[in-house]
């Protein structure tokens, strides 16, 4: 019986609260709606770039603390003629943030410092935008959620002051940002370009970093060219620290500057970029492009990519993986530079690499392949001054090689090189003469013999460093010591060089 009375009392109390809330809604909502309309109109008038701002009606829900504007139209003075419209714009804010908008309540609800939630969500439906003779587009839906900011910046904005941009960004938090079905047409000097974006997604913007960014079904087209990407994604993006970011933004690489001034700016920027790229936490953890394509004005101008991916997990210790799958380029891309590739319409690249720290050195393994040319596999251990690449030529030249092994399987590369000689029928003697000239001395006898086997019947060429002792990079290419430093062996292929040439270019 006692529990039944408790349940009954709770039910009655809940009903009363609901009735009170409904009563408050009926009284307060019209007041808030009128006030919001006045504030929005007043704000639009204060912003010099806005010429006109209007909406058909305003709705306020005190229970959800959401404000909804219908049929929004904004016309800008600058850029001239820019128009934006939305069928519906809804803004939902936390109770504290809503109270901060009331000057008499602000001292009691707005803290002196620290992070505070300023917006639960903002959603916009049926967005369109245009500039006469330049731009026209639409966006089906956009939403932003979980926005937080430093209380100092909230106070500054409410007082009409503009916070310093980097400081504002450093303390801002956005849980999510989504956009669906963006379409735009841009007028150019030679015609028009159409762009579409199926979806955009951002997750976890905080501490000058972004946890996830996705662009899906991104396409662009003109009257003669088309390009598209099924997916562009980035995880774990980290911008430079606030101090470095301010310095980078202060440097303006203006095309009107003199070459001397530009060189000075670049010299100022490069060390900061090196510091950003070589920090313990990489600037981006994952970068990926999937299903990219390009089609030019001519039928042969076709390029495509199935996958390109970078996994940059750490700089200290070094850990990185890269992959390229089916990068296809037209053969005419290299033929236009004088290289003749009979019977070949496309160049198809594939490759993978795995780089990681191993006993204080960097171990790199992987392969590169070009269809109908050959495949190279490698496994090398090396060290660089400082232990981390700083993307400088001096550091690259100062690196030392410990152990290294390379294996190349010929699938037509040598035959194509021979076919591009002045007299292809004399390619064999020419190769032998070039080997005798390039690798003289008795120390290179075994190396020359192996290379001559390979050029006579292209098959597999294996090159292995004979010692694991650290060797300066430049010394690895010293002709006088190549034969002692590298062991070269060749496995003959099934066809001779001339048989390959006849198969690749039978009409020669």
Q: Which residues are covered by each model-predicted region?
A:
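Short, Lys/Arg-rich N-terminal segment immediately upstream of the first membrane anchor
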Residues: 1-5
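Glycine-rich, small/hydroxylated-residue low-complexity segments
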Residues: 6-11, 23-508
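Low-complexity, highly charged intrinsically disordered N-terminal segments
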Residues: 16-23
């Amino acid at each position: 019986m006692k529990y039944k009375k408790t349940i009954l009392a709770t039910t009655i109390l809940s009903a009363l609260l609901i009735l009170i809330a409904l009563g408050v809604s009926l009284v307060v909502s019209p007041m808030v709606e009128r006030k919001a309309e006045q504030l929005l109109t007043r704000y639009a008038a204060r912003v010099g770039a806005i010429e006109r701002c209007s909406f058909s009606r305003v709705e306020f829900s005190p229970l959800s603390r959401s404000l909804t504007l219908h049929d929004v139209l904004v016309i800008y003075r600058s850029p001239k003629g820019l128009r934006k419209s939305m069928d519906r714009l809804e803004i939902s804010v936390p109770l504290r943030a809503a109270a901060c908008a009331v000057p008499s309540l602000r001292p009691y609800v707005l803290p002196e410092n620290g992070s505070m939630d300023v917006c639960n969500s903002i959603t916009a439906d049926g967005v369109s935008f245009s500039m006469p003779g330049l731009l026209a587009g639409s966006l089906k839906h956009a939403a932003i959620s979980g926005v937080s900011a430093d209380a100092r910046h909230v106070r500054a904005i409410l007082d009409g002051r503009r916070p310093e941009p980097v400081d504002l960004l450093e303390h801002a938090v956005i849980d999510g940002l989504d956009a669906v079905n963006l379409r735009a047409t841009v007028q150019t000097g030679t015609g028009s370009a159409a762009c579409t974006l199926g979806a955009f997604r951002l997750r976890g913007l905080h501490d000058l970093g972004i946890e996830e960014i996705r662009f899906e079904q991104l396409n662009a087209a003109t009257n003669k060219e088309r390009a598209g990407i099924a997916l562009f994604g980035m995880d774990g993006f980290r911008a430079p620290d606030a101090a470095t970011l301010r310095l980078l933004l202060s440097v303006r690489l203006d095309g009107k500057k003199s070459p001397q001034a530009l060189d000075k700016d670049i010299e100022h920027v490069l060390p900061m970029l090196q510091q950003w790229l070589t920090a313990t936490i990489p600037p981006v953890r994952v970068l990926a492009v999937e299903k990219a394509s390009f089609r030019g004005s001519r039928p042969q101008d076709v390029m495509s990519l199935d996958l390109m991916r970078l996994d940059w997990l750490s700089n200290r210790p070094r850990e990185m993986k890269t992959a390229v799958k089916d990068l296809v380029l037209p053969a005419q891309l290299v033929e236009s530079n004088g290289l003749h590739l009979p019977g070949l319409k496309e160049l198809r690249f594939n490759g993978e690499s795995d780089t990681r720290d191993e006993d204080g050195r960097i171990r790199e393994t992987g392969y590169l392949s070009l269809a109908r040319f050959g495949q190279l596999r490698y496994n090398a251990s090396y060290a660089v001054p400082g232990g981390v690449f700083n993307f400088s030529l001096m550091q690259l030249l100062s690196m030392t090689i410990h152990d290294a092994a390379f294996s190349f399987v010929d699938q037509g590369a040598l035959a194509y090189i021979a076919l591009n000689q002045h007299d292809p029928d004399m390619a064999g003697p020419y190769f032998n003469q070039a080997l005798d000239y390039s690798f003289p001395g008795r120390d290179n006898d075994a190396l020359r013999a192996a290379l001559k086997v390979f050029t006579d019947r292209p098959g597999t060429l294996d090159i292995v460093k004979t010692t694991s002792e650290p060797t300066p990079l430049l010394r690895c290419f010293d002709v006088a010591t190549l034969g002692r430093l590298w062991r070269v062996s060749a496995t003959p292929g099934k066809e001779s060089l001339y048989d390959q040439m006849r198969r690749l270019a039978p009409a020669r």
